[in-house]
Amino acid sequence: MPYSINNLTNVKKLSGGSENTNYLITANNHHYVLSLFERKSPDHVKVLEQLLSHLNKNNFKTSQTVSTTNGQTITYWNKKPIIIKHFIEGKIMDALPNHIIELVGEATGKLHQVPAPDYLPKTIDYGQENFKLVNQYAPKTSFKDWILAIRRYIQPYLTIDLPKAFIHSDLFCSNIIISSDEKSVTIIDFEEAAYYYRVFDIGMTIIGLCSEGKVINQEKVKSFLIGYKKEIKLTPDEEKALQPFTVYAGAAMTFWRHRSFNYVYPNMGLKNHYKALQTLADYAKAQSSLFFKC
């Protein structure tokens, strides 16, 4: 191994997403996480490593990469990129209590104040710009009708000059490490980061952290917004756009799951995985705008 990580005592595969495979490595009583990127290009992984370095240099708490003995931060196995990061002590919870969600809101507000580097993508792979792809892979389906109806619904809000920032765009429970005393949180996994609408990130976090089954918990939404507003005050236009962008975020992830597991990487076990998020997007759309106020 080209790293100065010696005396390996344990390697354990971690549960994780479909985009990479993660292993917990123990050596010399220190823990590390090795991420093997199954589907990301070397260029994409290079940007991710640069982002982590950029975040740490700007005093945003997140993962820190480990360099090889000759200073490289990316290596390869079977032509697939690898990054090793220092393990962050803490826990991941499947459902977050309100006080933790408030901490995540505050951390998200801090993230949105980190200067966005020029190389940060200006769009997201599952954004509304790509919803039209449904015409190619799923024409004459009810899903096509649904996703294009959502696109029409959000169009008026895309013409507003809404603030953009360095966003995470994938803030679900699996990407948040909570300290043992539950007084701090660390946001990880910036693989989908972009320079995009702040309110999209807020909407995605509402979908990712504030949902309970088929509904969204309003008190959790309020907790997140209370934390966020400790760092950033929403503009009047963002206040108006929050509900549509929550719908947009839910639809975007629905689109990603539908396309990924039915067409790009067909998986019979996950073919209906998109429906839970579709239900949440519809739920958000059906609420009064007051639901998203705090």
Regions found by a protein language model. Name each.
Residues 253-294:
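ATP/Mg2+ or Mg2+-diphosphate-binding catalytic cores
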Residues 81-95, 131-132, 251-267:
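A glycine-centered beta->alpha junction motif in the catalytic cores
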Residues 18-26, 33-34, 65, 155-200:
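Active-site acidic catalytic loop and adjacent metal/ATP-binding pocket
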Residues 27-118:
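ATP-binding pocket architecture of kinase catalytic cores
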Residues 1-9:
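Juxta-kinase regulatory segment immediately upstream of eukaryotic protein kinase catalytic domains
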Residues 12-16:
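Protein kinase glycine-rich loop
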Residues 199-232, 249-265:
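Active-site activation/catalytic loop segments of kinase-like enzymes and analogous catalytic loops
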